[in-house]
């Protein structure tokens, strides 16, 4: 609601935007662009093709100011648009002769056929041209006509029209889709859904809508949620009107019936302010109803997309996983590959950020969290000054939902354009001063609007919070001490490319450990006072309770103090007793705050450098308590934030405008097919250790390396958290997002050494030693993780490179895992002492005796091989469904110090195959 109010109160310039005014009023910038001699950076490294000549001819006839005549090859006679002045380039002088030193024969010169003069007229005079329709194969029936046109639209073999259609049609920046073919809208729902998918003009908004539809659990859940929101809003308005305008509170002490205190015809005697408020609410309510009706069409399209294209029925929307949705989107993309090669300049510019080829799990997360990634990075790099300019709050960062909305409006809405992309003008160093001044003005406007609306927003939040939680606090007084993470903690803990539902799940799993840590920490003085209060209040309540047993009717009306009966004091004392008991620790609880904090860090992935080695200290407990606060305290801070946010926007944040502009310029990169994204959100899957360097940058003496790195190991934690969600199978805890039995398998043929084999005894001793080592190291070998017997076909295991949710260029290298990703799920489920993987040392790697890193070369150490059940006689890895396992790309370690007879046979087979090649 607050964001909608912001967008409606912002002065909108329908004529031109701030960036257009900036380009026109800056005389020193873009001189090359105005002179026509700037470098085309977009096509600087692009290869030249023959079909570019056709595009150049079309541009010359439609848009260009310069075109050659039909008979003039050497000169350049210009043809102008009507009403425009000729603007000939300096290097295309009229009558310039060919270079006499040119050794290329004229017969080898490639020239495009010149268009007639009547085709070089302006589009307004020439008018649109309609090509002759192609004949329909077979009988010309209505059904065949509709199918033929749908096929021509989806699988176009040659250009039937003079101008491109679909999402590439129109001028740059428009991307208007082609209108549906005749008869398609009345045809098959699958064809309709496919047509809408092919003609998506803004891929970012579409993917966000798909994700929002998934979060809301389908069509009917969204409809019910929207209707109930309207019902709740109407109830609050009617209920408050009744309580404030229709009840005579002066008659309440002396009345016994509702009719005695109700004011007759109260709606006709309401105050002017309340009448205006009700009319404004009525307008808002009607707009929401019309918005819901209009939104039904979009929701129906999303339902068709899930049902017909992704093959996910409406009944499964509440139980399907997001990984399954991503996999089906990739399958839909792969089933309709792009075959067009002769793209125009407008098409290339459009596909630079809207390409459907960039739709794997990594790209989808980047599209959904394009804005949030910049927000996470700004808070991690301490770019924003969020301190309160008051004497007692200068050292505290103030982050609330109100501040988040203000930052989203002031910064993100200014940086991003209507297409969801970073405006290129914001990335130019020459615009730094103007952009900084504009940010200051936006901060001032946002602070002023929040200050004006603060009384109404505060009153609304207080009423809603009171009506929501009063019954809960009354029935369970201990809920007053329930804690949760505040807004600052959520943005500090959130990782790059981590979607909302994944982040919420991670935070929810950390709540039991956080509560245990807070309750465990020494509070002896508080407990002593709580025990005394509990004893006194409990004793009084017990005596009063026993007295009510003998004569309940007379004793409950007995007044202990004037106008205060026994029932009143019993309720008050019972509440105090419950609050006191809630502050007393359990007698069976084990005191170990360091172990409890390690369990929290396993889920939050947040451990500042000054926490290391001091997890038991009171300072760490106080810092964590600032992030994990009681719910009533968070609510009071949100109410107070409405008054403090204008101070932050008017005083503190304007000091950070230069740093904000520099941050976006230095930490924004362009990815082909994806557009502008945050630097830290692009993971280097091929070199997993490159992401780990982000975590160790604090130890590096190079200030430049530290400047371009994240703090507290955020980059490494985000990278491995992403692998856990999209590479590690959540059902098995192993790499790969398919069950092992449903994937391609490679099994070595079983070989049985004879009983007289001289190596049989040694091999059996070796197997016994490996099992003993596994038991001594505390490794639990059970189920599919146990070591396969020597004389049986081994059980195949997944490959860390096998993820169907990542494209080949995003497939992680074996060294990116080490042994960490294989076992991190189990470590997070059951934390153990000394087993915490910090953000900086987030990779657990096996080191050989020579000191070399096995994980760097994609190998496993001895303990890892023993734990995973892999050896030379076993199939240790399994490839993705689109690739077959070969001996070169398998993850098995071909070198081992001790090998048995099966290992020797396997090495002999490998050597024999290499010789045959």
From Swiss-Prot:
Main subcellular location of this protein, as a coarse class: membrane
Post-translational modification N6-acetyllysine, affected residues: 621
Residues the record marks as carrying a glycan: 269
Post-translational modification: Acetylated by HAT1 at Lys-621, which increases the ability to bind vesicles during nutrient starvation induction. Phosphorylated by ATG1. ATG1 phosphorylation is required for preautophagosome elongation.
Region (Disordered): 16-37, 119-177, 854-895
Subunit composition and interactions: Homotrimer; forms a homotrimer with a central pore that forms a path between the two membrane leaflets. Interacts with HAT1.
UniProt note: domains: Forms a homotrimer with a solvated central pore, which is connected laterally to the cytosol through the cavity within each protomer. Acts as a lipid scramblase that uses its central pore to function: the central pore opens laterally to accommodate lipid headgroups, thereby enabling lipid flipping and redistribution of lipids added to the outer leaflet of ATG9-containing vesicles, thereby enabling growth into autophagosomes.
Claim: Transferase is one of the keywords in the record: no
Topology, Cytoplasmic side: 1-226, 297-442, 464-539, 586-633, 655-917
Record key words, sorted: Acetylation, Autophagy, Cytoplasmic vesicle, Endoplasmic reticulum, Germination, Glycoprotein, Golgi apparatus, Lipid transport, Membrane, Phosphoprotein, Stress response, Transmembrane, Transmembrane helix, Transport, Vacuole, Virulence
GO cellular component, one term: phagophore assembly site membrane
Sequence ranges on the Lumenal membrane side: 248-275, 561-564
InterPro entries: Autophagy-rel_prot_9 (IPR007241)
GO biological process, one term: lipid transport
Cellular localisation: Preautophagosomal structure membrane; Cytoplasmic vesicle membrane; Vacuole membrane; Golgi apparatus membrane
Result after altering residue 621 to R: Disturbs the acetylation levels of ATG9 and impairs the binding ability to vesicles during nutrient starvation induction
Family: Belongs to the ATG9 family.
Polar residues biased stretches: 875-895
Intramembrane segments of this protein: 443-463, 634-654
Name of the protein in its database record: Autophagy-related protein 9
Reaction(s) catalysed (UniProt annotation): a 1,2-diacyl-sn-glycero-3-phosphocholine(in) = a 1,2-diacyl-sn-glycero-3-phosphocholine(out); a 1,2-diacyl-sn-glycero-3-phospho-L-serine(in) = a 1,2-diacyl-sn-glycero-3-phospho-L-serine(out); a 1,2-diacyl-sn-glycero-3-phosphoethanolamine(in) = a 1,2-diacyl-sn-glycero-3-phosphoethanolamine(out); a 1,2-diacyl-sn-glycero-3-phospho-(1D-myo-inositol-3-phosphate)(in) = a 1,2-diacyl-sn-glycero-3-phospho-(1D-myo-inositol-3-phosphate)(out)
Domain of life: Eukaryota
Membrane topology: Multi-pass membrane protein
